[in-house]
Amino acid sequence: MSQVDNRNSSAAKRARTDGGRREDDWICPSCGNVNFSFRTTCNMRNCTQPRPADHNGKSAPKPMQHQQGFSSPGAYLGSGGPPPVYMGGSPYGSPLFNGSSMPPYDVPFSGGSPYHFNYNSRMPAGAHYRPLHMSGPPPYHGGSMMGSGGMYGMPPPIDRYGLGMAMGPGSAAAMMPRPRFYPDEKSQKRDSTRDNDWTCPNCGNVNFSFRTVCNMRKCNTPKPGSQQGGSSDKISKQNAPEGSWKCDNCGNINYPFRSKCNRQNCGADKPGDRSNGSPSRAPEENDQ
């Protein structure tokens, strides 16, 4: 007949990896598996050995085995207490930084304290939490913007976090917040207009220099004559073939064979006084 574990309802669940054994845990005499105290049978697969009858739940605890070179944390602390903080030396045998360890317990604390509590310049021996000895100016002191006090008078990272490691100026500056980079004001306030751009006298629209008429919708006002000489028309006055004519409405220069202005939204007729010079009329006049 298989036995069923009678788990105590008041016992809190505990993971296997939460630390070492507890006092009331028991070892299976068959397979050597360590079982929680609430188990009545071994939970090892294919074992189910019942708990020994002589188990009184108060066996001596076994300290955890530490690797060589590691210092033991001392007496076993229950799950309710916080883990110890090693202030007097490195818990791994040798110091990690600069070959020197942190200040030991019960050492007079010199210099300004960054905390608002009065410790009477001495911390109690064996205290787990205490302010680290910090070399350098106290935090939030007056000074230059990027001086020894850090950014905006903030202490350097070694003072703020108590890392206990030496940092060069480059490393400390890398951990600081970078100031915002603002480009030159001239690049931000760059003028949107160019020297050769022109303003429409009718609607006030600013046009690019290459435009000959205003590009504002339903405007099409020609470029003022004072600025038209430098514009790049399809047919300039210098390169216009003989017999070309200028539109009286928009000022566009048209080829001789055109009878109407080819400017968009213009379509004005060719002036009558110049119609006789058109090549299309020449054959008819010669025929007569």
From Swiss-Prot:
Region of interest called Disordered, as start-end residue ranges on this chain: 1-24, 52-77, 176-198, 222-248, 265-288
Fetch the Pfam families from UniProt.
Answer: Zn_ribbon_RanBP (PF00641)
Name the residue ranges with Basic and acidic residues bias.
15-24, 181-197
Modification type Phosphoserine: residues: S278
Q: Name one GO molecular function term.
A: mRNA binding
Q: Which Gene3D superfamilies match?
A: Zinc finger, RanBP2-type
Does the record carry Cell wall biogenesis/degradation as a key word? no
- SMART domains, per database record: ZnF_RBZ (SM00547)
Zinc fingers, RanBP2-type class: 22-53, 194-225, 241-272
Q: Give the UniProt keywords, A-Z.
A: Metal-binding, Phosphoprotein, Repeat, Zinc, Zinc-finger
Compositionally biased tracts (Polar residues): 1-11, 223-241
- Tell whether Phosphoprotein is among the UniProt keywords: yes
Q: What is the official name of this protein in its record? A: RanBP2-type zinc finger protein At1g67325
- What organism is recorded for this protein? Arabidopsis thaliana (Mouse-ear cress)
